[in-house]
From Swiss-Prot:
Protein name: DNA mismatch repair protein MutL
Organism superkingdom: Bacteria
Gene name of this polypeptide: mutL
Annotated GO biological process: mismatch repair
Keywords assigned by UniProt, alphabetized: DNA damage, DNA repair
Record organism: Bacillus thuringiensis subsp. konkukian (strain 97-27)
GO terms of molecular function: ATP binding; ATP hydrolysis activity; ATP-dependent DNA damage sensor activity; mismatched DNA binding
SMART domains on file: DNA_mis_repair, MutL_C
PANTHER family, per the entry: DNA MISMATCH REPAIR PROTEIN MLH, PMS, MUTL, DNA MISMATCH REPAIR PROTEIN MLH1
């Protein structure tokens, strides 16, 4: 007798459920997406014990006809595609026909549905077996309840996380669906307590305000671009509003939330040097394209996609963000603490996106050089950098008006840190409607960020504090400038242009530099030897797993040759390519940091004025190459409020 046998449908569904239904969040995602595909305009999600005990989804969509109810729970049964041509033109969120049978096979499921023009259908399924089917009175739409999830797969149940974590995973999914479909009203409840309510009026900014808070919504920059193949719309935060995780960036493709590392990287590249190292923006990007250009049939969870014109899309995203930021003055405001507590606390802060971190491809970042230790080497000697100042013989004394106790100046728009879960509110429909109307009104009152150019306004110096911070003023208020960061930006743009113009000339090393590698690393570097020659780095094999370098490009900064060579090797080993543009930029950053004035260095008024004027000539006078802010602003109104001149 043969050993190979065909598995029965129930066992096949259990196996399929392992990929489709990983946790309660997977069930919520699949069922809510089905509701959206059914043209629902209102969806309610009710949870008990983070969905492990009960998940109930109620919608007002098209419903399911009686004759389709049983078929819907068979494997690969779907109304969304008919043939292989449809598979490459998918516009719906679901299409595989795996979700419902997979969910039903590992839970106790109850379905009440009606198309509105016939009696409804009541269906009960337990562990994949149909227990009951009957006609029932029902409004148009679908009401589906999933209870005792994983009751028949105890091994899966054992690996569920805490209630807090599983609820965080669900809210993460619901938030992203809400952003993807602002035209759908979503209500999320946990143990009969409301967590989220969106109006469904199509305003993405209002959804973002519901999730992240009205304060974050006020710091959103609208993004819009179009090419022959792609249309991009969305919002990203100003560089002053960041998080410690990239999971606060959401990418939507044809209405589907996807996890795509290269899209997130493109958003980061759009900020370029505006972000501090290790900080990420809050962003929402909706991308529309011909379904033929994207493959969504990569994984049963449908979170991963592949693009056929990926490089064109990435370039469009980067250029769109860079263009938007060039139109804005990126000076963060230094706020004043007031007695009034902000009403709108971010729902997102309750259940942080960290609970649902996406698994990213193992493509490590090449870390940009951090700010160098101020006690390291002396500044490099260059012919035409920004002026390098020496402390004046007569130490400049700050005006008496500035000699006072050091105050704690904190920008009001500093990165919003993650906060613990706050108490959930019991659901009250009247209170809910009032809160939603109040939020709508606040979003309508948000002033659009002025797109009137990013030129730094004229600044008039009035003093210096601790030999580190410059005070300046104009008709808009008081400015505080970090003198090291300011000159670092000036020098960076000088060195960046200088390094970028250098021809492919090489310089001999006095002592050859030896590079020892593992066998895998050696093979990868050997594969890229010709590419390395094109950028002026010549390697000679030395032994079985080593190379020696006898010469290097002339643009390598003096004293940093071996460090740049190591960076190039790291690129080749990890990225399997040589990015000369990135290497030159890193060299410019290192050179600019070393050549800049340091803290605790007093300047004359003339030197301060010259520094500010030179800063105004840079293309980005707002952040240093490492993304730290160069200056912060106190408006005249804020100062008057501090001193109780206005109330």
């Amino acid at each position: 007798m043969g050993k190979i046998r065909k598995l029965d449908d129930q066992l096949s569904n259990l196996i399929a459920a392992g990929e489709v239904v990983e946790r309660p969040a997977s069930v919520v995602k699949e069922l809510v997406e089905n509701s959206i595909d059914a043209n629902s305009t209102s969806i309610e999600i009710h949870l008990e014990e983070a969905g492990l005990s009960k998940i109930r989804i109620i919608d007002n969509g098209d419903g399911i006809a009686e004759e389709d109810c049983i078929v819907a729970f068979e494997r690969h049964a779907t109304s969304k595609i008919k043939d292989e041509n449809d598979l490459f033109r998918i516009r719906t969120l679901g299409f595989r026909g795996e979700a419902l049978p997979s969910i039903a096979s590992v839970s106790e499921l109850e379905l009440i549905t009606s198309t509105g023009d016939a009696p409804g259908t009541h269906l009960i399924i337990k562990g994949g077996d149909i227990i009951k089917q009957e006609k029932t009175a029902s409004r148009k739409g679908t009401d589906i309840t999933v209870q005792n999830l994983f009751f028949n797969t105890p091994a899966r149940l054992k690996y569920m996380k805490t209630i807090h974590t599983e609820l965080g995973n669900i809210t993460d999914i619901v938030y992203r669906i809400a952003m993807s479909h602002p035209e759908v009203s979503l209500k999320l409840f946990h143990n009969e307590k409301k967590l989220l309510h969106t109006s469904g009026n199509g305003d993405v900014r209002q959804v973002l305000a519901s999730i992240y808070s009205i304060q974050v919504a006020k710091k959103l920059v609208p993004i819009e671009a179009e090419s022959l193949d792609f249309t991009i719309k969305g919002y990203v935060t100003l560089p002053e509003v960041t998080r410690a995780s990239r999971n606060y960036m959401s990418t939507i493709v044809n209405g589907r939330y996807v996890r795509n590392f290269v899209l997130m990287k493109a958003i980061q590249q759009g900020y370029h040097t505006l972000l501090p190292v290790g900080r990420y923006p809050i962003g929402f990007l909706s991308i529309e394209m011909d379904p033929m250009l994207v493959d969504v049939n990569v994984h049963p969870a449908k979170l991963e996609v592949r693009f056929s014109k990926e490089q064109e899309l990435l370039k469009l995203i980067e250029e769109t963000l860079q263009t938007a930021f060039k139109k804005i003055q990126l000076i963060p405001d230094a706020g004043v603490t007031t007695k009034k507590k902000e009403k709108d606390e971010s729902v997102q802060e309750q259940f942080q996106f960290e609970h649902a971190k996406p698994k990213e491809p193992s493509m490590p970042d090449i870390i940009l050089p951090m700010g160098m230790d101020e006690k390291q080497e002396e500044p490099l000697a260059v012919k035409q950098p920004a002026q390098l100042w020496q402390p004046p013989k007569q130490e400049w004394q700050p005006p008496q008006s500035l000699v006072r106790e050091e105050q704690s100046w904190q920008p009001s728009t500093k990165p919003i840190m993650e906060e613990p879960i706050r108490e959930e509110k019991s659901w009250d429909s009247n209170e809910e409607d009032f809160e939603l109307e109040e939020l709508e009104e606040e979003v309508r009152e948000i002033e659009e960020i002025e797109m009137n150019g990013n030129d730094l306004p004229p600044l008039y110096p009035i003093g210096q504090m601790h030999g580190t911070y410059i005070f300046a003023q104009n008709d808009k208020g008081l400015y505080m400038i970090d003198q090291h960061a300011a000159q670092e930006r000036i020098n960076y743009e000088y060195f960046r242009d200088k390094v970028g113009r250098v021809a492919q000339e090489v310089q001999e090393l006095l002592v050859p530099y030896r590079i020892d590698l593992s066998l895998t690393e050696f093979l990868r570097v050997e594969e890229q030897l010709e590419e390395l020659k094109k950028v002026g780095l010549f390697l000679e094999q030395f032994g079985h797993q080593s190379f020696i370098v006898r010469s290097h490009p002339t643009w390598f900064p003096k004293g940093q040759e071996t460090e740049i060579i190591d960076e190039m090797m790291e690129q080749v080993v990890k990225l399997k390519k040589v990015d000369i543009k990135k290497l030159r930029e890193e060299a410019a950053i290192m050179m600019s940091c070393k050549a800049s004035i340091k803290a605790n260095q007093y300047l004359t008024n003339d030197q301060i004025f010259a520094l500010l004027e030179e800063l105004r000539t840079t293309t980005n006078p707002y952040t240093c190459p490492h993304g730290r802010p160069i200056l912060v602003h106190h408006s005249t109104y804020e100062l008057e409020k501090m001193f109780k001149r206005v109330m």
